[in-house]
């Protein structure tokens, strides 16, 4: 059986990342290109077409409804882990999670260039019961050896569960925002709603590598600037639309921008421009004044020429001063309509 595998890059790379870093490349949702590619591989004799996609789960579901001839979409980017495939017409969409937590097994029954049946299984990975490959382990150890002492240095400890995922906040992000507020002497902190980075359990040592695992970006400068209340509202509205726009093709994936020192209410059922209300400066309890300027610290700006220390150094310095970090529950965001 001839199987064609088509790669689909993340379509929003120039928006979600600094476009000035890759000016010679172009990205986007281009259903006509995908349709042409499917037709091309089918004409070349492919009996099964698999798309290896970084679109995100919702975008892949819509693409499956628009582009004919795809049998399987192996969906990435949004880190969803689903025990059963999502079926769109004659296409199955499979989401297998992230960080090596699962591997999906897919058995297909292909006859006369048609998928007439399938079996799938989402298999959890328990690393402590799988014997590592000795040759690969040795190669990894060799590559890490020059950096091992730096990576394994203990910076502090956590009393709290540190996790990334959450539509509006996560304790890792709360800790990063706390670091931005204190180390950059700011009233408000903004941190991107990225989904990567493993969790840490209460009582664990925090090593430098643990910090790198949740902050490593090629544009990690921690800026400090002034923003008006109006601009803060615009930013929150813009990010919210990337997540809650009813059309998946306008969703970039990821979670809501994390905020430190700033509370707000969001109604996810409203249209863009009407979702965010009750912006509040938490240290005073006062509503944000649209015309007033506030000192804001953040990182991962897509703007060229951003100035500031690297975010991993900011977080490391904060944790060193704390010794043991404790992150309490975050109730600064009120969600309506979810």
Describe the predicted segments one by one.
Residues 1-131, 135-137, 167-179, 243, ...:
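Acidic, metal/ion-coordinating pockets
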Residues 22, 97-338:
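Catalytic centers of hydrolytic enzymes
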């Amino acid at each position: 059986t001839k199987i064609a595998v088509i790669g689909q890059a993340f379509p929003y790379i120039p928006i979600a990342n600094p476009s000035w870093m890759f000016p010679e490349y172009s990205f986007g949702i281009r259903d006509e290109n995908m349709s042409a590619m499917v037709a091309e591989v089918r004409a070349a004799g492919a009996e099964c077409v698999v798309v290896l996609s970084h679109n995100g789960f919702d975008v892949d579901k819509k693409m499956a409804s628009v582009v004919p001839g795809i049998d399987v979409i192996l969906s990435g980017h949004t880190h969803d882990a689903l025990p059963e495939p999502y079926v769109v017409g004659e296409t199955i969409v499979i989401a297998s999670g992230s960080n090596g937590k699962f591997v999906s097994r897919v058995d297909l029954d292909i006859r006369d260039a048609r998928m007439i049946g399938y079996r799938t299984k989402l298999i959890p990975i328990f690393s402590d019961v799988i014997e590592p490959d000795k040759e690969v382990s040795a190669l990894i150890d060799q590559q890490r050896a020059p950096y091992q002492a730096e990576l394994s240095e203990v910076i502090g400890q956590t009393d709290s569960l540190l996790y990334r995922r959450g539509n509006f906040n996560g304790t890792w992000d709360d800790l990063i925002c706390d670091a931005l507020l204190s180390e950059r002497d700011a009233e408000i902190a903004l941190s991107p709603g990225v989904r990567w980075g493993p969790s840490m359990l209460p009582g664990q040592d925090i090593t430098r590598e643990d910090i790198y695992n949740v902050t490593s970006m090629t544009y990690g400068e921690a800026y400090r600037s002034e923003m008006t209340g109006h601009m803060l509202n615009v930013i929150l509205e813009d990010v919210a639309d990337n997540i809650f726009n009813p059309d998946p093709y306008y969703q970039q994936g990821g979670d809501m921008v994390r905020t430190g020192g700033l509370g707000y209410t969001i109604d996810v059922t409203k249209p863009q421009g009407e979702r965010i209300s009750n912006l509040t400066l938490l240290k005073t309890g006062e509503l944000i004044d649209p015309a007033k300027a506030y000192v804001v610290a953040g990182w991962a700006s897509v703007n060229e020429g951003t100035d500031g220390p690297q975010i991993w150094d900011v977080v490391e310095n904060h944790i060193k001063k704390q010794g043991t970090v404790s992150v309490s529950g975050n109730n600064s965001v009120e969600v309506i309509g979810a």
